[in-house]
């Protein structure tokens, strides 16, 4: 996973949320949205699922900011599903699994940053999603920050594989 790109036809593209500022995606989130739109234009999925809640003081959820982006790019409202409560990857993907079950979505393509892909895929499997991944081509997170994120993700994957990602999520939130 990581820098791999497993893109192939699926039922839905799932865009994992990231920071947004008053409805405007952060550069990291924008890279995810742009990549998902590129995949959408390749006709790889019928639906887009946008994820992410909001932090204290926010007026908009990450999912609402993502929906607005896709609507301005011509994706029809009825083809976008919103998961707007999750504040963690685990919570968002657990909610996506419920949406997928309700909407008869069998296979999803998860879009996130390269360093985040393996953990996202493993969490998706734990919550019952049939998932493949497609990472953004590059991350706006570079240098020391990228190194730190990769270490955090590696630790998260290791611990999650041992005790389960649900337990890790409950410890950290």
How should these model regions be labeled?
Residues 1, 170-173:
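N-terminal secretory targeting signals
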Residues 2-151:
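A structural signal for short, hydrophobic/glycine-enriched beta-strand patches
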Residues 146-170:
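A transmembrane-helix-recognition feature enriched in membrane-embedded lipid enzymes
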């Amino acid at each position: 996973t990581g820098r791999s790109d497993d893109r192939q036809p699926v039922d839905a593209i799932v865009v994992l949320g990231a920071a947004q500022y008053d409805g405007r995606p952060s550069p990291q989130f924008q890279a995810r949205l742009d990549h998902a739109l590129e995949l959408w234009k390749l006709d790889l999925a019928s639906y887009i699922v946008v994820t992410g809640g909001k932090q204290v003081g926010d007026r908009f959820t990450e999912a609402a900011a993502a929906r607005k982006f896709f609507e301005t790019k011509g994706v029809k409202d009825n083809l976008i599903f919103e998961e707007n409560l999750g504040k963690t990857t685990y919570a968002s993907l657990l909610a996506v699994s419920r949406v997928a079950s309700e909407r008869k979505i069998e296979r999803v393509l998860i879009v996130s940053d390269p360093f985040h892909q393996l953990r996202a895929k493993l969490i998706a499997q734990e919550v019952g999603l049939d998932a493949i991944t497609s990472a953004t081509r590059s991350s706006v997170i570079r240098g020391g920050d990228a190194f730190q994120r990769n270490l955090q993700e590696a630790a998260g994957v290791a611990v999650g594989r041992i005790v389960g990602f649900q337990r890790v999520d409950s410890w950290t939130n």
